[in-house]
Amino acid sequence: LGLQNATSPIMEELIAFHDHALMIIFLISSLVLYIISLMLTTKLTHTSTMNAQEIEMIWTILPAVILIMIALPSLRILYMTDEFNKPYLTLKAIGHQWYWSYEYSDYEDLAFDSYITPTYFLEPGEFRLLEVDNRTTLPMEADIRVLISSQDVLHSWAVPALGVKTDAIPGRLNQAMLTSTRPGLYYGQCSEICGSNHSFMPIVLEFIYFQDFEVW
């Protein structure tokens, strides 16, 4: 169990922030448990104390410092996710009940629908409920802009290994940036409950080398 292996700079930053926040939470929890154990096993109580400026300063400043230590890396990643350089390719992903459709508009008018592959059509080594009939092919090590929308209800286009999760909202275009540092297949799913077949909207991205993508 755990996070998927990162294949994009954003996901690497998210994993590092997860470890950073988890370490702070662990230290705080250990300190609280230590103080509770001291209070239960020793006479570390002062019921007659009416005023202690030093202690009040400590438990005011220390939480503020801890929050700043968590907030600064979080804000940095937030701005990174909204940073859009000149994209090499623009892909449009449109959610439907219950499949995805994709459009490549930079090269030619290429569009297709991507449905889940039924279990009885799976080949050996393929994943149940994660395979599709038409994979989305993209070039690796390139900045790719994905425009995400919906044709009917709320959906969410999510690929955990790339650190991407963007809502698909009817009548609105949201955008996300993709960059893969290595070739391969990366799986995702709709991450917004959208009806009875919500669990059957997989996403499969196939990242290949530049020269292979141009041929494709």
Swiss-Prot record:
Cu cation A1 binds at residues 155, 190, 194, 201. The lineage of its organism: Eukaryota, Metazoa, Chordata, Craniata, Vertebrata. Its cofactor is Cu cation. Binds a dinuclear copper A center per subunit. Residues 40-53 are mitochondrial matrix. GO terms for biological process: ATP synthesis coupled electron transport. Component of the cytochrome c oxidase (complex IV, CIV), a multisubunit enzyme composed of 14 subunits. The complex is composed of a catalytic core of 3 subunits MT-CO1, MT-CO2 and MT-CO3, encoded in the mitochondrial DNA, and 11 supernumerary subunits COX4I, COX5A, COX5B, COX6A, COX6B, COX6C, COX7A, COX7B, COX7C, COX8 and NDUFA4, which are encoded in the nuclear genome. It holds the Pfam family COX2. It is an enzyme of class 7 (translocase). Keywords: Copper, Electron transport, Magnesium, Membrane, Metal-binding, Mitochondrion, Mitochondrion inner membrane, Respiratory chain, Translocase, Transmembrane, Transmembrane helix, Transport. One of its GO terms (molecular function) is cytochrome-c oxidase activity. One of its GO terms (cellular component) is mitochondrial inner membrane. It is found in: Mitochondrion inner membrane. Mg(2+) binds at residue 192. The keyword Transport applies. The keyword Membrane applies. It is a multi-pass membrane protein. Belongs to the cytochrome c oxidase subunit 2 family. Cu cation A2 binds at residues 190, 192, 194, 198. It catalyses: 4 Fe(II)-[cytochrome c] + O2 + 8 H(+)(in) = 4 Fe(III)-[cytochrome c] + 2 H2O + 4 H(+)(out). Residues 1-8, 82-216 are mitochondrial intermembrane. InterPro entries: CcO_II (IPR045187), CcO_II-like_C (IPR002429), CcO_II_C (IPR034210), Copper_CuA (IPR001505), Cupredoxin (IPR008972), Cyt_c_oxidase_su2 (IPR014222), Cyt_c_oxidase_su2_TM_dom (IPR011759), Cyt_c_oxidase_su2_TM_sf (IPR036257). This is Cytochrome c oxidase subunit 2.
